[in-house]
A protein has these predicted regions:
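Short glycine-rich anion-binding loops that position phosphate/pyrophosphate groups of nucleotides
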Residues: 96-102, 210-212, 230-233, 261
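Glycine-rich phosphate/diphosphate-binding loop of Rossmann-like nucleotide-binding domains
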Residues: 39-53, 135-224, 228, 233, ...
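Rossmann-fold NAD(P)-binding glycine/threonine-rich loop
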Residues: 106-122, 126, 229-279
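Positively charged, low-complexity intrinsically disordered leader regions
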Residues: 1-30
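Anion-binding alpha/beta catalytic cores of soluble intermediary-metabolism enzymes, centered on
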Residues: 92-155
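N-terminal glycine-rich anion-binding loops that anchor highly charged ligand groups
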Residues: 24-35, 40-58
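Short beta-strand elements in bilobed, periplasmic/extracellular small-molecule ligand-binding domains
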Residues: 34, 56-70, 184-186
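Short, well-structured alpha-helical segments in soluble
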Residues: 76-88
Length: 279
């Protein structure tokens, strides 16, 4: 039976450190407001936003949950973000991805002040990450690294296959892995014979939001799987990851479950970024 890479102990360790810092900043009168902004009703974003707002309130932040309509114009979204950026009570802003079709992510992200951009969406901040000048990457990418560190997985020389090339996980995670001397392969929707790549991997990170894209027959024995995917079950009851847990678990040495894995850490990494952005 594979070792389960649980997110809760990782998140709990982070929360202990954050709690003291939050109380310190409260006494100093620093802003603790947090704007969680979603445009449309992408299922994974709805789930993530709910978890994030709840966790933020529990730790002592002052979360503001914002859901803009699917049909919102680019101008409307930008104006909302600019208003939040000018609000002195708001310490940080997180804009959930993906955005509805027709909205330009880069133009919209520029409306988030760099000092309040908790997920490195502003092109300037993102560019620093991709150039290797900053390790302050999007929170989910950092959560994967935090999990690997907690479970003492040495990335040096390992072949890591990342499934997905999004700006919030795949691309920045590849840079973070390279900084740890891993050999990284990034696969995506146009990759031919995905299994050819995953069968040679020491660590596979599925991160596309496609349930079952990774199955046990696509892994070599003893591989690790850190599942970033969040998908609503077909019956609408709960969530599942991108990896087919039932077939992967007997093959793996270690695997993160969904729910119960990276998600809990991602939430805490966002809250950590809120504190960092006030420094």
């Amino acid at each position: 039976m594979a070792k389960q890479l649980l997110g809760k102990p990782v998140a709990d360790r982070l929360k202990e450190r954050l709690s003291a810092e939050i109380e310190k900043r409260r006494r100093m009168g620093k802003a603790l407001g947090f704007a969680a902004v979603r445009v449309g009703d992408d299922p994974s974003s709805v789930v993530y936003q709910g978890r994030l707002v709840k966790a933020a309130a529990t730790l002592g932040f002052e979360p503001l949950e914002i859901a803009l309509p699917e049909e919102s114009s680019e101008t409307e979204v930008i104006e909302k973000l600019k208003a939040l950026g000018e609000d002195e009570k708001i310490a940080g802003i997180l804009l959930f991805m993906p955005l509805p079709k027709g909205l330009d992510k880069d133009r919209i992200s520029r409306a988030i002040p760099i000092e309040k951009d908790v997920d490195a969406l502003n092109p300037v901040q993102f560019g620093d990450v991709m150039a290797g000048r900053s390790l302050w990457a999007p929170c989910t990418a950092r959560a994967v690294m935090e999990m690997a560190d907690y479970y003492e997985y040495d990335l040096t020389g390992k072949h890591v296959v990342i499934i997905g090339r999004s700006d919030v996980v795949g691309r920045p995670l590849a840079q973070l892995m390279l900084a740890r001397n891993a050999t990284v392969t990034v696969c995506h929707s146009r990759t031919k014979d995905l299994a050819l790549h995953t069968r040679s991997a020491d660590l596979v990170v599925p991160a596309v939001g496609q349930a079952g894209i990774l199955t046990g027959d696509m892994l070599k024995p003893g591989a690790w799987v850190i599942d970033v995917g969040i998908n609503v079950r077909p019956d609408g009851q709960g969530i599942i990851g991108d990896a087919d847990f039932a077939s992967c678990e007997p093959i793996c040495e270690a695997i993160s479950p969904v729910p119960g894995g990276v998600g809990a850490i991602s939430v805490t990494m966002v809250l950590e970024a809120l504190l960092r952005d006030q420094d």
